[in-house]
Amino acid sequence: MNKKDILELKRRFKKEACTFTRLCGCYVDADRNKITTFGETFLNLEEEEFYKYLEIAKKVLSGTLGNNILNLEFPLEEEGSGGKQQFLMGLRASALKNEELMEAFFDLVIDNYSYAGNYLILVYHDAYDVMTKTSDNNKLDESEEVYEYLLCAICPVALSKPGLGYREDENRIGPRIRDWVVGVPDTGFVFPAFSDRSTDIHSCMFYTKDAKAPHNEFVESGLGCNSKFTATEQKLTFQNIVKDVIGEDDAESEALFLDIHDNLNNLIPFTEDETAEPEPIPVTPSTISSVLSESGVPDDKAQVIEKTYENIFGEEVPIAEHLVDPKLLEVNAKRKEKLELVHQVENLKQQLEETRSVPVEDGEDDVPATKTYDVILRVKPEKVEQIHSQIINGQKCLVIPMDENEHAAVNGINTTV
């Protein structure tokens, strides 16, 4: 599923376009006990409930593709008899009306979802009549196929915050009654996937709210798919690989680490169109080798980083965009700006020193030097009495009479008068 596929589904989650046929749910406590289960025709829900459940469904299709949203493929063994994919196919075919299948699904989630607290399992059934589109994306009034799918959302349920409130039955302000509130989804999935505006029964879309710690136990045991790194996991893992080798306790290591990020960012093609998706650039071990070399990482350390990188990521090669941390790019830009300012200040100091350095003849070391005057004269004692001021062409001037063949130096430049 790409961004267009996800947005096409998500845009339909509103009152006038929604086609959800049924909603089923199971409320589970912290001890994994089923507190209650329910099943409803979606369009029969009360208006407030209708919109709340729609908001939950939208959240499962929210976030960044490759980070919060992952495309997962089913292994061949899961597509055979008794496999997870076959079970989900049967659940979809039942349109959530088979109670035994629903109970089996809830048990599957409870047994394979690790969460310390109460939560609500929600499953939606939908049948989307996919309209044919022309090459310029205009819809034609004819059906291309019916995309029938399940959307599952697993939402944490927590007590509302304590506080004071108006107790109407007692007509006073007192402790507010705390109740259990359903939160936004922590985990979810869509089966089958909607790829290139068509049903893909060999794949599903997985959603995680926390990209740093997705529920891989549910991916592997609940859905029967191989877990994948999120973009956040790839970025943090790569940073740890580099820091473990080059260190992070001194300024030199930090500068090297930041330069590696800059060079990775240079791999990403620049585009002025902010809506356009950047072309994914795979960062293979050989690419890492080039980046490390360009950044000035010593060969022995570079080899360790490359080997560890290849062992951890294997065939699941990250793209450059997933490894780059915008915050670190900003830090490095400020660091380079500061270094450039320091360099400019040093150059200015050197230029000032050269400008102010005027040769002093022997015996004149006792002449007081000061930087508060615009003009500083150093002359032989016998010429002091000859110096006088005079108005010339309306301009006040300092006149120093010069004898034939006398020499003068102005700002260190020798002049013969």
Summary of predicted features, one role per range:
Residues 10-31:
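Leu/Val/Ala/Ile-rich N-terminal alpha-helices, chiefly Sec-type signal peptides and the beginnings
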Residues 23, 27, 119, 410-414:
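General "foldedness" signal
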Residues 373-377:
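C-terminal helix-loop subdomains that flank or include functional centers
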Residues 367-368, 378-417:
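Extended, charge-rich low-complexity regions and/or helical-solenoid scaffolds
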Residues 29-365:
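Long, hydrophobic alpha/beta structural blocks
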Residues 7:
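Active-site-proximal "nucleotidyltransferase
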Residues 1-4:
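Phospho-regulated, Ser/Thr/Pro-rich intrinsically disordered or coiled-coil terminal scaffolds
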